[in-house]
Curated annotation (Swiss-Prot):
Coiled coil: none annotated. One of its GO terms (molecular function) is flavin adenine dinucleotide binding. Keywords: Cytoplasm, FAD, Flavoprotein, NAD, tRNA processing. PANTHER family: GLUCOSE INHIBITED DIVISION PROTEIN A, PROTEIN MTO1 HOMOLOG, MITOCHONDRIAL. This is tRNA uridine 5-carboxymethylaminomethyl modification enzyme MnmG. One of its GO terms (cellular component) is cytosol. The keyword Cytoplasm applies. SMART domains: GIDA_assoc_3. It comes from Bacillus cereus (strain ATCC 10987 / NRS 248).
Length: 629
């Protein structure tokens, strides 16, 4: 027998990385919010790698922070090591990566949630949604509690009909042997949602005391203070190194001999795995010409001896995992503390979502994270933030927020999901962003802080600091454009010392900075600023001046794209009435129901001829209403 357990503006199902961002965003925007999770001890748990960031993903964390989300602040307080990657490359691909103390990360984020006004955290398993007349009105838990709500966000991760697989062992489970969610998955199918089966995996954990680190290569953090959050002022400098080793020919022989026992190759696993995070079995089979593969030994925290064996994700049986570990240099006498495993789970087909992450089938129902077919904590957190923002906007009667591909990697991620869908766990890569020179690690605040402030997630004090930073950047760029540096002896000497060509005539400081060998520090030595500027300001000045031509070209591409995005397609357009459309294009357009011609042009199977036909149809005003509306 059910009972009325309360009423909320927003209910979030799940408290992983997507759920935490969704719940915090909704509550901070003023919505009365409830977060329901199967196990309170697993809030913000890291079931796989103990790290945050990396290529593209690190930029997402900066974007989350720029919008007012929590992930960046939380990892800044709880990491054991931080490194800037790709420092030898251009600014578009630089990315920050932090090694997390996974237990501190959990505890700190749970504490933040517990102390947030408007936010209630409760342990309970949701089994059904309350749906009336095509609208989600709330949820029903296993215990019979009925919670009503204006909006609901599902962030169930890999728990939906989760199954752990290791060799020929297979059992119903969520990650890390947690209770899975079976009934909710079945209920979503009853509601008419198309589900797919995906798979991911995790490597074994080993005891640090049994590793011979003398046979490995140290991987220290950066000496320079680093942070994901634009608010962080206190930096952790007491860092713990990671270690690099490699598989051996003996490792590969052992894997080859036991491939028939791997769930990946025995037919036990039916779900599709992540292309960019293959198991060690996959790597050995697909790249059999390589004599070895990198293995990173990553501590899981400051107060544990558990070490994550990055690069050794596997579904081999436990006995093979033990033997395999001991074929790796430095791990000859290692003790395994946890076995690696594969996990299969249900995900929804993401083309069933609007760009707001609201489902098309049921109004006021949003989904975010791995349920949408993505992989990774950062991708989940970015979606969770946007779903939480939009659920709150809906509950408060405000306009929802959609980030474009030119605005953020989060925008690229969501657009790819809802427009193209995915047939494997989706991982964000820099190559997926056509405007990546505009979507950099360094300028996330310049791109998104105003949006965060407008929706109420960025406080006035922070916004004031941000506007001051913007002003300083513009003033310094103007100063450098107005100063002429003459070929004085000290100028020529500096230029010679850094391998540049001497000046023949006077040159604007900004033009001199455009030279590849010149940095802002060099210019500052020649024409110092009277105002003390932060590293963040001078970095922006240098990048914006050096890459001005390329940035301008990207902005022109964005303007062309925006013309297509501005051509809106009515939600109730009847594609069957457009007789000239190719049959594949018609079906794809009916499935995705794009909101603009720009979005339609990105759908696989819709070619330029179809877009031309669609444009003519819309511009002539021949919009046929759906007969039952």
């Amino acid at each position: 027998m059910g009972y009325n357990a309360g009423s909320y503006d927003v209910i979030v199902i799940g408290a992983g990385h997507a759920g935490c961002e969704a719940g915090l965003a909704a509550a901070r925007m003023g919505s009365k919010t409830l977060m329901l999770t199967i196990n309170l001890d697993m809030v913000a748990f890291m079931p796989c790698n103990p790290s945050v960031g990396g290529p593209a993903k690190g930029i997402v964390v900066r974007e989350i922070d720029a919008l007012g989300g929590e992930m960046g602040r939380n990892i800044d307080k709880t990491h054991i090591q931080m490194r800037m990657l790709n420092t030898g490359k251009g600014p578009a691909v630089r990315a920050l990566r932090a090694q997390a103390d996974k237990f501190s990360y959990q505890h700190e984020l749970k504490k933040t949630i517990e102390e947030t006004p408007n936010l209630t955290l409760f342990q309970g398993m949701v089994e059904r949604l309350i749906v009336e007349d095509g609208e989600c009105k709330g949820v029903i838990t296993q215990a019979g509690a009925e919670y009503t709500a204006k909006t609901v966000v599902i962030t169930t991760g890999t728990f939906l009909r989760g199954e752990i697989i290791m060799g020929d062992l297979k059992y119903s489970s969520g990650p890390n042997n947690q209770q899975p969610s079976i009934t909710l998955s079945e209920h979503l199918e009853e509601l008419g949602f198309d589900l797919v089966r995906f798979k991911t995996g995790t490597p074994p954990r080993v005891n640090s005391n049994t590793i011979d680190y003398s046979k490995t290569e140290i991987q220290p953090g950066d000496d320079k203070p680093r942070a994901f959050s634009f608010e962080t002022t206190k930096f952790i400098m007491d860092q713990i190194p990671c270690w690099l080793t490699y598989t051996s020919t003996e490792t590969h022989r052992l894997i080859d001999e036991n491939l028939h026992r791997s769930a990946m190759y025995s037919g036990m696993i039916k779900g599709t795995g992540p292309r960019y995070c293959p198991s060690i079995e996959d790597k050995v089979v697909r790249f059999n010409d390589k004599p070895r593969h990198q293995i990173f030994l990553e501590p899981e925290g400051r107060n544990t001896q558990e070490v994550y064996v990055q690069g050794l994700s596997t579904s081999l049986p436990e006995d093979v995992q033990r033997d395999m570990l001991r074929t790796i240099p430095g791990l000859e006498n290692v003790e395994m503390m946890r076995t690696g495993y594969a996990i299969e789970y249900d995900a929804i087909v993401p083309t069933q979502l609007w760009p707001t992450l609201e489902t098309k089938k049921i109004k006021n129902l949003y989904t975010a994270g791995q349920i949408n077919g993505t992989s990774g904590y950062e991708e989940a957190a970015g979606q969770g933030l946007m779903a939480g923002i939009n659920a709150a906007c809906r509950s408060l009667g405000k306009k929802e927020v959609i980030l474009g591909r030119e605005d953020a990697y989060i925008g690229v991620l969501i657009d790819d999901l809802v427009t193209k869908g995915t047939n494997e766990p989706y991982r964000l890569l820099t190559s997926r962003a056509e405007y990546r020179l505009l979507l950099r690690h360094d300028n996330a605040d310049l791109r998104l802080t105003e949006i965060g402030h407008e929706i109420g997630l960025i406080k006035e004090e922070r916004y004031e600091r941000f506007t001051n930073k913007k002003l300083q950047i513009e003033q310094e760029k103007e100063r450098l454009s107005s100063i002429i540096i003459k070929p004085r002896p000290e100028v020529q000497e500096l230029i010679r010392n850094i391998g540049g060509s001497e000046l023949k005539d006077g040159i604007r400081a900004s033009d001199l900075l455009r030279r590849p060998e010149m940095t802002y520090e060099h210019i500052h030595l020649l024409v110092p600023s009277e105002v003390e500027l932060s590293d963040e300001v001078t970095e922006q000045v240098e990048i914006q001046i050096k890459y001005e031509g390329y940035i301008e070209k990207s902005l022109q591409q964005v303007e062309r794209m925006k013309k297509m995005e501005s051509k809106k397609i009515p939600v109730d357009i009847d594609y069957d009435a457009i007789s000239s459309l190719a049959s594949e294009a018609r079906q794809k357009l009916k499935d995705v129901r794009p909101l603009s011609v720009g979005q339609a042009s990105r759908i696989s199977g819709v070619n330029p001829a179809d877009i031309s036909i669609l444009l003519v149809y819309i511009e002539q005003g021949k919009i046929a209403r759906v007969s039952n509306q």
